[in-house]
Structures are given as C-alpha cells and as structure tokens.
C-alpha cells in the first residue's frame, strides 16, 4: 500500500454550513472527527487524504473556505 504524505505547509479551512440533524450517525461522527459540531464553526486542518475523504463524505454539510 502506497501512502502519500501532504506537503509540509498545506492546510485546508472548513466551515460547517449544515446541521447533522436527520443525517446518519456516520455523518455526525465524521463532522465530530473534523472538529465541527456547531453551525458556522471553522477549523483549519492538515490537507491529507484522510481529511479530504472525510470532507467528501459530508460535502453537503461543510464548505471549504481556504486551501493553502
């Protein structure tokens, strides 16, 4: 299995724009894993494949604000 490492300075800022109410427990847990649990809360995360996968699972609940 080949693992790709992120660039040292790469980060991504995400903001929660949707409520996890009426969504599955898995999506609620994914938001929690991203550090998001309230509306309009923002987090700066390392830009890794794992984080990108989590964002993709809840793309209807979050917005990517800044990639840098």
Swiss-Prot record:
Family, as annotated: Belongs to the universal ribosomal protein uL30 family.
GO CC annotations, alphabetized: large ribosomal subunit
Naturally occurring in which organism (per UniProt): Bartonella quintana (strain Toulouse)
Any matching Pfam family: Ribosomal_L30
Molecular functions (GO terms): structural constituent of ribosome
Gene expressing this chain: rpmD
InterPro entries per record: Ribo_uL30_ferredoxin-like_sf, Ribosomal_uL30_bac-type, Ribosomal_uL30_ferredoxin-like
Gene3D superfamilies named in the record: Ribosomal protein L30, ferredoxin-like fold domain
Protein name, entry field: Large ribosomal subunit protein uL30
Keywords: Ribonucleoprotein, Ribosomal protein
Membrane spanning stretches: none
Lineage of origin: Bacteria, Pseudomonadati, Pseudomonadota, Alphaproteobacteria, Hyphomicrobiales
Description of how the protein assembles with itself and partners: Part of the 50S ribosomal subunit.
């Amino acid at each position: 299995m080949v693992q790709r490492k992120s660039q040292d300075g790469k980060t991504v800022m995400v903001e929660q724009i949707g409520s996890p109410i009426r969504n599955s427990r898995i999506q609620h847990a994914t938001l929690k894993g991203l550090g998001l649990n309230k509306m309009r809360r923002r987090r700066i995360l390392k830009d890794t494949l794992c984080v990108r996968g989590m964002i993709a699972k809840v793309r209807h609940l979050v917005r990517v604000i800044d990639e840098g």
